[in-house]
């Protein structure tokens, strides 16, 4: 049994007599690509949040476009991740991507996000990923737009939709 992810997964799957037991499409929303910034750093430098979000969605727009520039971007990303354009595009086709800030903002505001992160915290606790002192899955707090789960005095992860909203509304260029 091998646990891996793309691009290596595609190579393993091409090996004779292999079969896939599980993939992340079976746990939608549980594996999320994030841009993470220290809370104090972001509070002290809100323009950093705007710049990072703007750059993120500029790249997402380019890489998702059916243009020579989009193909070039995907080709460079493919090479950087150890595969070719065809392999990289196959990975993208099998991955739920938030190509627009509007879609990401809607996900950040959804009821599914706190429910999913609660399941992730439970899994993490069960497998000892919250640290030796954790007495329950609620040992850490996770903050969302208008709600939180876990320990309010020990917030370790914040899903702040502020910059997604600005980008979705066209206020970040």
Model features per residue range: what roles?
Residues 30-32, 83:
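Extracytoplasmic
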Residues 11-24:
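Ligand-binding "clamshell"
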Residues 10-11, 122:
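Surface-exposed charge patches
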Residues 1-4, 20:
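Paired acidic/hydrophobic, glycine-rich loop segments that form the ligand-binding mouth/hinge
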Residues 43-133:
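Secondary-structure end/capping motifs
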Residues 32-47:
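A bilobed periplasmic-binding-protein/Venus flytrap-type ligand-binding module shared by bacterial periplasmic
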């Amino acid at each position: 049994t091998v646990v891996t992810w793309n691009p290596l997964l595609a190579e393993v799957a091409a090996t004779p007599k292999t079969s896939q037991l599980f993939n992340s499409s079976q746990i939608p929303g549980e594996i999320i690509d994030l841009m993470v910034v220290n809370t104090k750093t972001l509070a002290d430098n809100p323009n950093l949040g705007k710049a990072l979000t703007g750059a993120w969605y500029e790249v997402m727009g380019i890489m998702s476009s059916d243009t020579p520039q989009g193909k070039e971007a995907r080709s460079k990303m493919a090479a950087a991740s150890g595969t070719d354009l065809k392999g990289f595009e196959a990975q993208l086709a099998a991955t739920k991507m938030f190509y627009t800030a509007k879609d990401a903002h809607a996900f950040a505001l959804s009821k599914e996000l706190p429910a999913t992160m609660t399941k992730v915290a439970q899994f993490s606790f069960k497998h000892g990923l919250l640290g030796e002192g954790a007495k329950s899955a609620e040992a850490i707090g996770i903050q969302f737009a208008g709600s939180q789960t876990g320990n309010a005095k020990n917030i370790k992860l914040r899903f702040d939709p502020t910059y997604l909203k600005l980008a979705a509304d066209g206020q970040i260029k």
